[in-house]
Amino acid sequence: MARVRTNTKLKPSKKADLQVVKPVKTTRYSDIDLNNWRAYDHVKTDTLWEFPTRLKEGGHSNEYHGNYIPQIAQQLYERFTKKNDVVLDLFFGSGTSGIEAINMGRRCIGVELKDELAESVSQKFTPKQLVTDVRIICADSASEEMREKVQASLDIMRE
């Protein structure tokens, strides 16, 4: 079960006059206010996520067979990460997870088995992002070598 912390900042409800003001309540892994979660219109809260179209802006394209729609990453990152957190994608592919991480103020470590795909996806990021916010590791996701490279990348990103 996730531990919950309560911020001391108070956030008024929609009817601020004479209404009870609840403290902002978040978890250690998300900035979503648990006392006000229904007010997040951009976060899908039902069990079926329907998106009218696939996002194509912000660096996304549909050139790789193993990709998924960026809105899935958006929904997951909104719920389970905070700004500046590091997202680990062990099957980086076309970089959808990394692009969305950057677009949402997160950082990303992507592991990709194919050299040519890792090189191609690195072109989607700026040289500065590849130093500070995105690490692309070419390795087998099940290997000890990958674990060591991910740990080294995490150490660098924490500095």
Segments predicted by a language model, with ranges:
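Class I S-adenosyl-L-methionine-dependent methyltransferase catalytic core
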Residues: 2-159
